Amino acid sequence: MLLHAPLFGAIALSACSTDSTSGGDHGIPDLDGLANFIVDSARLASSWTLGSDYVEAGSCTSIEYGISPGTHRVLRFTVSTPNIGDADAVVGDPLAHVDPNHDGDFSDSDGLFEYAPCHNHFHYKHYATYELLPVLAGGALGTPIFARKRGFCMDDSEPFLPGVNANSWVYRACGTLTTHGIQGVHTGWSDVYVRTLPGQYFVLDDPAQPTPPGEYVIRITVNPPYLPDSTDACPVRDEQNFCRVLRESNYSDNVATLRITLP
């Protein structure tokens, strides 16, 4: 998700190349093969910055990300997760996952999405993790601090691979309670979360997780391994029997790290 507005109305995979609301021609889904996600380490290295963020009481940032009202010192960064595989990563319509029988009752949800009422759209769970790890004496890494971002809307934000046509995007509709969406990342494209998005940062002055000056490592993992709880889905098992939300041709290139100094 960069800053694209969602497409409205029911959207099927077969309709993506002809949907009249797109404002022009765009791509055709490529489902022959497997996706392969990486984290753009160069984008991470060039985008991180220190600053402040004022959080209003009752705002979506405060409610959804659990940040106390007031001005906070934050570490912002942009995350770009390109799909360099030979096929699309397709999630589809969130409503089909949370309400498969279309009765308005989410009790039969498959657990892949959670509804964010403040923003009135669905967040895809377990797409990525953002960690800030202190570098301890001897070079070991300490207990991670997690960024406040909790959910994701997968889309074709930017072309990534050379030669990719800027009009070849397929997936750009997050979906809401009343509009169908289609989430995914087309081969050769990247899903991008720019540093100015709400919650796209580490809170550095949280008294529960103090972040003193020193050396740290930012670690971004796309499609991370996880152990499911009672509300989670487990669509894919990797070679170590961990759950993944997306099937890929290669899970070994899903992490980017960056060592930084916090003054």
Predicted regions located by residue number:
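Extracellular/luminal regions of secreted and cell-surface proteins that mediate adhesion/ECM remodeling
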Residues: 23-263
